[in-house]
Amino acid sequence: MKLLHLDSSPRGERSISRSLTQQFVSLWKQMHLDVPVIYRDLGRYPVPAIDEAWIAAAFCPPAQLTPELQSALMISDELIAELLAANLYIFGIPMYNYSVPASFKAYIDQIVRVRRTFVVSADGYEGLLKDKKVLVITTRGGSYAGEPLDFQEPYLRAVFGFIGITDVTFIHAENLAIGSEERQLAIATAHEAIQQVVKTWQSSTCI
């Protein structure tokens, strides 16, 4: 069993979402010393946006892929291989303009791919990533959970569900830009929520 850990904030050591995802990983590894962790830093090392060559390759019948088209999918293949190899996902995603950072949107575009993470049949679309768990930790300047301006959680739930991931947990650290007291309360609340998710995953995951 493997854990896939993604950060998408470009803020480096100042990032709250990074510190929160790291807390989860540290707690998880304390209980599962031998569980490998795949780490990808989308904030510092963003994946490229998909382009015309990528689209042509992704929808080309596999038997007709040329070396050039195969090359266009190399990064996508690598990212999807990481997804398939892991059973548990921890994603740190700050809210930017009521949604996700561009780095995470580019990541989603690379991994949502026909015949790899979903298939199309006479019955419609079917996601291929079964029996996975994902924890999404978001950081937000204000309070948006359940509000019309929250285009982040509904979007991510829809995308993850489309590729087959339905066991999705969100922890929202909100009001981080309101004031120091609100900020500290939000971080402390997120720490408690992370500890609870670790306990829940521990009780429901066979290692």
From Swiss-Prot:
Q: Which GO terms describe its molecular function?
A: electron transfer activity; FMN binding; oxidoreductase activity, acting on NAD(P)H as acceptor; oxidoreductase activity, acting on NAD(P)H, quinone or similar compound as acceptor
Q: Which domain of life is it from?
A: Bacteria
The EC number(s) attached to this protein equal 1.6.5.-, 1.7.1.17
Q: Which Gene3D superfamilies match?
A: 3.40.50.360
For this UniProt record, give its keywords in alphabetical order, as a comma-separated list: Flavoprotein, FMN, NAD, Oxidoreductase, Plasmid
The record's listing under InterPro entries reads: Flavodoxin_fold, Flavoprotein-like_sf, FMN-dep_NADH:Q_OxRdtase_AzoR1, NADH:quinone_OxRdtase_FMN_depd
Q: What does this protein do?
A: Quinone reductase that provides resistance to thiol-specific stress caused by electrophilic quinones.
Recorded protein name is: FMN-dependent NADH:quinone oxidoreductase 1
